[in-house]
């Protein structure tokens, strides 16, 4: 892709192009931040009005039954399941990634304590998204045994970090900063052969790349719905536990929604035999209902078509940045190899924050991550090839004119 006309031609031939019309995208904005917050499905506003106005406003408490609120976490989990290689009854929409990670990590450590008490080490990556590490650190602090969080600095170091003391490997499939993607089947096999349990974070994978959790024989996973799945800001996350583990994994947040018969109101906790045991308290129905609007769009295509366009978009973006912005201090930190790349492209720049603020001021929305990383997410459901061209041209102009040096672009916002 060497001209804007070529980009427009690619858009005309794009089989996913009609899906863009199902998103409410503001005019004059090129949105390359779907890896942080997905765009709003057009159906979401009407769905919100239905939930608030009719189901809550008129149905009141009856809607737990008549509108299907009570079954929503499991029903939506079943709809999400095909996107991550899961079966019906293995996914629940609930809580946040951090909370679900706490549940699963604690359940896995408890399981190992019963069957292999010597295993007290959690292996993860130093470059993992911080909340994953914070949750592990906090959980270890609560335990009355000598647990350890062991961090590796390179994916190649994982085999050497695994030993007969490893309980769980907690790995994020696609790195939030660089977009590096692990080989899920290979990593899972390595971890399981070492006698450890494999816990995946799919925050930057679900809805972005094909995932096959059951095919890889993973042991558990968490993910969010507000990025590529377009569930809305703060929409509830998801937890996946394969059926072979569901009765054996006992999560610590034993709230009433995880009980086998919540309305029996028994004084002693008896966990649900299935995925519902990973629920805790009453669910956020309004925000959870919005998740279905994003899933409705995914139902009109498949992850392989999404992946093909994702790679084409990121290939084009990287090539254009390196040709149109040649001579600028930009360093690609995202892998070039397709099998190692998620659905984003990240570049390092000495003044990355200021450059990103200048881009946003001109209607090209990406985001910034420390240290010095310009991060661009590509969501094939609504990102066009002409968006790629126009974004790079805007970046080139900002760098050539040094427009990023304007004082207002150096002011740090609370959210970057």
Swiss-Prot record:
Its cofactor is pyridoxal 5'-phosphate. This is Kynureninase. Homodimer. The gene is kynU. It is an enzyme of class 3 (hydrolase). Pfam families: KYNU_C. The modification N6-(pyridoxal phosphate)lysine is found at residue 227. It comes from the Bacteria. The lineage of its organism: Bacteria, Pseudomonadati, Pseudomonadota, Betaproteobacteria, Burkholderiales. Belongs to the kynureninase family. Pathway: Amino-acid degradation; L-kynurenine degradation; L-alanine and anthranilate from L-kynurenine: step 1/1; Cofactor biosynthesis; NAD(+) biosynthesis; quinolinate from L-kynurenine: step 2/3. One of its GO terms (biological process) is L-kynurenine catabolic process. Keywords: Hydrolase, Pyridine nucleotide biosynthesis, Pyridoxal phosphate. It catalyses: L-kynurenine + H2O = anthranilate + L-alanine + H(+); 3-hydroxy-L-kynurenine + H2O = 3-hydroxyanthranilate + L-alanine + H(+). It comes from Burkholderia pseudomallei (strain 668). GO terms for cellular component: cytoplasm. Pyridoxal 5'-phosphate binds at residues 97-98, 129-132, 172, 201, 204, 226, 256, 282. One of its GO terms (molecular function) is kynureninase activity. Its EC number is 3.7.1.3. Catalyzes the cleavage of L-kynurenine (L-Kyn) and L-3-hydroxykynurenine (L-3OHKyn) into anthranilic acid (AA) and 3-hydroxyanthranilic acid (3-OHAA), respectively.
